[in-house]
Amino acid sequence: MGTILAIDPGNIQSGYVIVEHDGEEIRRVLEVGKIENNVLLSLIAQKLYGNGYDVAIEMIAGMGMTVGQEVFDTCVWIGRFWQTVLWQTGYGPTRIFRREEKLDLCGSLSAKDANIRQALVDRYAPGQPYFGKGTKKDPGFFYGFAADMWAAMAVATTYFDKYIKGVKL
């Protein structure tokens, strides 16, 4: 079994997911959350130390438009996460761009967050209630997921498809 840590970076908080796969498919979510960036730095160091996780992080791409301070702050955090992964593993994380996620999961660059979430549900939790979250009594594949955690799962799935399964995007 292999393990992937995927990060959807933000300027203050970031979504992350740790998933386990068997080379054929992602089989389960081990951990998911949205936490303060400085806490995530510590978590990265703790989780990666000697564990052999693959690491993927969503990378910001230039779109030809003016951006605000939040985007630049997010870029700084991407660099800090990158450096921590490099120190712990000897290699940097794999960059996953949003356009790759859209193509991999939806087959279209015009896909929106709702389309990506539905593609994830269709793939990992078909027929499960509440977008695959289930209930407290009967948790589904995506139990505990909210907001940026879905984006982190899209990063993990795209990384898995592209680098583990070898799907051409």
Predicted segments with their positions:
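Phosphate- and other anionic-substrate recognition elements at nucleic-acid/protein interfaces
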Residues: 1-169
